């Protein structure tokens, strides 16, 4: 992979201490998107990684997964599918709940967005626990999609989400890694 592009991307991601709560060092990808060279480098690296792999759909999770998944889908010439929180999608949906640190959350996808045999790549900004992508994987598979790959801009490997997703049979790719939570 292009180390110059990775360095540019990593340097553009601001770290915000004690957000959203004390003890968390938040990695802010919105600062990456403020830098057009870093944003383009991110999309270019994703395209270089996944072009020619035969994906028929790109799925992005709410909300920052949209910001990387949609441009990737355009570059690969495939459809983009948003996975959203309940009540945000207008057509018939299927839902999947998942556990959070304190409680549960739910994601939805249009039932007609994935057809049997679609080869799907999931994209999100950051991999921490893997709960969001695990729920997304279940939604795609429930609709008959084939999902074996998940791509992230950032991985926080100490939290263990990559291992969790590998346990679901997913190949996990991230552009850069950061220590901590």
Swiss-Prot record:
The pathway is: Purine metabolism; AMP biosynthesis via salvage pathway; AMP from adenine: step 1/1
| Key words, A-Z | Cytoplasm, Glycosyltransferase, Purine salvage, Transferase
Write down the superkingdom of origin: Bacteria
| EC number of the protein | 2.4.2.7
Pfam families, per database record: Pribosyltran (PF00156)
Q: Where in the cell is it found?
A: Cytoplasm
Say which family it is in.
Answer: Belongs to the purine/pyrimidine phosphoribosyltransferase family.
PANTHER family in UniProt: ADENINE PHOSPHORIBOSYLTRANSFERASE
Q: What is this protein called?
A: Adenine phosphoribosyltransferase
The gene designation is apt
